């Protein structure tokens, strides 16, 4: 019997792929309408995404097959959804992130900030959280966590044992600082000699030798890295993929929205939200793992102990080993600043941006998008050399001159670019298009009209809690892709501004704090062996609730004037919402 269950479990992906489409067939057979056909496709993809029976990107390709065969959308129209402006913004932003990571600029920033904050417990944890959150705003959450966790463990090792300070004085390189990304599945720690040691054994031995105090500090440090990576991605439009899913869905479902979600408007709304949530997460982790002893945690009136001096020396040594800033790092820093400035000033809304002045269309709107800017800076990085131009000798062929490589080369980009996310974003946009064309969105909206009697803040909080729970066991991109079209239809049906529910639910997909499988940063810190699932769940449960409340605060305060959430927008009007005049919008929405 046990063997039978083991076989079923081993072949579960094949069984799901084979039986789920068959079990769902009664829906399109008994209800032969386009709405039912589209619902069949969406439910099938949602189940495949939740179970990961197929790779997420492969499931995202289903609309290319199902929608044309079901007569919902032409193949040529579906294909266009896979390379929209939001996808190009994601691609261009990642080009810059790959350049930052390739030339180790992110490590220099991290070490420099840690030298400033010092190594006393509370400032050290805050320093790690600030650095991780800032880097996560621009580069992938996974890459940020993979770099910061080894640094955190190296500092903790020095805090625990002052004997390691002798290695620092000799100028030896600390192998723990080497950038590594442990596999959550295999759960191993890679050493410099190429061997792999199981984390489980290291964990059991470590728990036997570590003092309870040091174990708590280690757990706190590990969680602060993965949590701040997820929180930091909230702040910018390119910080995490769900943010771009929202922008793409808004532009697809409501083409006349006037570019309401752009880099500047998103940052104005999400950055304060991120800062408040980050500070509250810092306080919560301190209370949970270190106790709320302000004087002790901040080391007020105490001299730096030998272990703390050793840990500080580790950071100093690693920062010194990076050497002075190279030409490539300086060039990338300048291009990065230019990119952010161009994003903010393109079409800010409260004054005419350079996009409106230099490249206006017939309506005076900017013809240049945030994606255009990102691609432009990305292309520049392929052109600018990584070393100051000069007569450089080829080390492999003495006597011959060799031009330096660019800041980016295609081989590096091809290796580090998460192409699967590009397809996943496209699959989400294709689903939204199919839902609109089939009439499923309109049908769902009509069924949800009774919600009009429920206060809008209550709707936003309940939906945010639902999404935050759902994303603990499902990809945040898949979660956003599934929920946003439904939420848009619901908002239209009850005469509520679509962004009033779509914004908080998008942010809620980043509140994946409870389980190691919820997000790659969680899996990375868990693989180092210092945490149990219960430790993460205990810390993440309250943080999830705090996050939902902070998002509710944001959407009902500074979010209202930023996006005019107090009234139903004209661009969200449809045939079924003709009665939703601005004056008749959901009156339970708070006024500014």
From Swiss-Prot:
Stretches for region Disordered: 165-185
Superkingdom per UniProt: Eukaryota
GO cellular component: apical plasma membrane; extracellular exosome; membrane; plasma membrane
Pfam family, one: Na_sulph_symp
Reactions performed catalytically: succinate(out) + 3 Na(+)(out) = succinate(in) + 3 Na(+)(in); fumarate(out) + 3 Na(+)(out) = fumarate(in) + 3 Na(+)(in); 2-oxoglutarate(out) + 3 Na(+)(out) = 2-oxoglutarate(in) + 3 Na(+)(in)
Any one Gene Ontology molecular-function term assigned to this protein's record: alpha-ketoglutarate transmembrane transporter activity
Tissue expression: Expressed in kidney and intestine. In kidney expressed in the proximal tubule (at protein level).
Regulation: Li(+) decreases succinate transport in the presence of Na(+), by competing at one of the three cation binding sites.
GO BP of this protein: alpha-ketoglutarate transport; cellular response to lithium ion; fumarate transport; succinate transmembrane transport
Record's bilayer topology term: Multi-pass membrane protein
CDD domains cross-referenced by the UniProt entry: SLC13_permease
Composition-biased stretches (Polar residues): 165-177
PROSITE patterns to which the protein is assigned, alphabetical: NA_SULFATE
Protein localization: Apical cell membrane
UniProt entry keywords in alphabetical sequence: Cell membrane, Ion transport, Membrane, Sodium, Sodium transport, Symport, Transmembrane, Transmembrane helix, Transport
Residue ranges crossing the lipid bilayer per the database entry: 13-33, 53-73, 86-106, 114-134, 221-241, 274-294, 324-344, 371-391, 450-470, 482-502, 511-531, 545-565
Family under the similarity heading: Belongs to the SLC13A/DASS transporter (TC 2.A.47) family. NADC subfamily.
Function: Low-affinity sodium-dicarboxylate cotransporter, that mediates the entry of citric acid cycle intermediates, such as succinate, citrate, fumarate and alpha-ketoglutarate (2-oxoglutarate) into the small intestine and renal proximal tubule. Transports the dicarboxylate into the cell with a probable stoichiometry of 3 Na(+) for 1 divalent dicarboxylate, rendering the process electrogenic. Citrate is transported in protonated form as a divalent anion, rather than the trivalent form which is normally found in blood. Has a critical role in renal dicarboxylate transport.
Protein name: Solute carrier family 13 member 2
Organism expressing this protein natively: Homo sapiens
């Amino acid at each position: 019997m046990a063997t039978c269950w083991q076989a079923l479990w081993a072949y579960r992906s094949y069984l799901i792929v084979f039986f789920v489409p068959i079990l769902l067939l009664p829906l399109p057979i008994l209800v032969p309408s386009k709405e039912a056909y589209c619902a069949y496709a969406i439910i099938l993809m949602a189940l495949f995404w939740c179970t990961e029976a197929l790779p997420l990107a492969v499931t995202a390709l289903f609309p290319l097959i199902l929608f044309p065969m079901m007569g919902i959308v032409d193949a040529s129209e579906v294909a266009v959804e896979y390379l929209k402006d939001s996808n190009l913004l994601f691609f261009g932003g990642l080009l810059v992130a790959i350049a930052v990571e390739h030339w180790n600029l992110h490590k220099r920033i991290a070490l420099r900030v840690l030298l400033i904050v010092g190594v006393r417990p509370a400032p050290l944890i805050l320093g790690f959280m600030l650095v991780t959150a800032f880097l996560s705003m621009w580069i992938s959450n996974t890459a940020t966590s993979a770099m910061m966790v080894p640094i955190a463990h190296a500092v903790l090792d020095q805090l625990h044992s002052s004997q390691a300070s002798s290695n620092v004085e000799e100028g030896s390189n600390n192998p723990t600082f080497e950038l590594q990304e442990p596999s959550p599945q295999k759960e191993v720690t890679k050493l410099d000699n190429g061997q792999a040691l199981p984390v489980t054994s290291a964990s059991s031995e470590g728990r036997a030798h570590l003092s309870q105090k040091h174990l708590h500090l280690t757990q706190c440090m590990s969680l602060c890295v993965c949590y701040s990576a997820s929180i930091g991605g909230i702040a910018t439009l390119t910080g995490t993929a769900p943010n771009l899913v929202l922008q793409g869905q808004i532009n697809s479902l409501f083409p006349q929205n006037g570019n309401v979600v752009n880099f500047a408007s998103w940052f104005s709304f999400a950055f304060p939200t991120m800062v408040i949530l980050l500070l509250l997460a810092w306080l919560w982790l301190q209370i949970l793992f270190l106790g709320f002893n302000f004087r002790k945690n901040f080391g007020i009136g105490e001299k730096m102990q030998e272990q703390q001096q050793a840990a500080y020396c580790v950071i100093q040594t690693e920062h010194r080993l990076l050497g002075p800033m190279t030409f490539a790092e300086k060039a990338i820093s300048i291009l990065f600043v230019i990119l952010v400035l161009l994003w903010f000033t393109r079409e800010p809304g409260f004054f005419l941006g350079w996009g409106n002045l230099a490249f206006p269309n017939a309506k005076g709107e900017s013809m240049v998008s945030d994606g255009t800017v990102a691609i432009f800076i990305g292309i520049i990085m392929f052109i600018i050399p990584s070393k100051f131009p000069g007569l450089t000798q080829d080390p492999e062929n003495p006597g011959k001159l060799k031009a330096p490589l660019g800041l980016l080369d295609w081989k590096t980009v091809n290796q580090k670019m998460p192409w699967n996310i590009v397809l996943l974003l496209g699959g989400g946009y294709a689903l939204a298009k199919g839902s609109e064309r089939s009439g499923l969105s309109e049908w769902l909206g009509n069924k949800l009209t009774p919600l009009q009697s429920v206060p809008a803040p209550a709707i936003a909080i309940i939906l945010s809690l639902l999404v935050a729970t759902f994303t603990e066991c499902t990809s945040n991109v898949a979660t956003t892709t599934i929920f946003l079209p439904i939420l848009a239809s619901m908002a239209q049906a009850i005469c509520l501004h679509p962004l009033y529910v779509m914004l908080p639910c998008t942010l809620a997909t980043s509140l994946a704090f409870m389980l190691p499988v919820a997000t790659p940063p969680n899996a990375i810190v868990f693989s180092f062996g210092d945490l149990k699932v219960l430790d993460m769940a205990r810390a993440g449960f309250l943080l999830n609730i705090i996050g939902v409340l902070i998002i509710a605060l944001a959407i009902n305060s500074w979010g209202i004037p930023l996006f005019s959430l107090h009234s139903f927008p004209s661009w969200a009007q449809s045939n079924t919402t003709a009665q939703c005049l601005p004056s008749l919008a959901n009156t339970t929405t708070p006024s500014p």
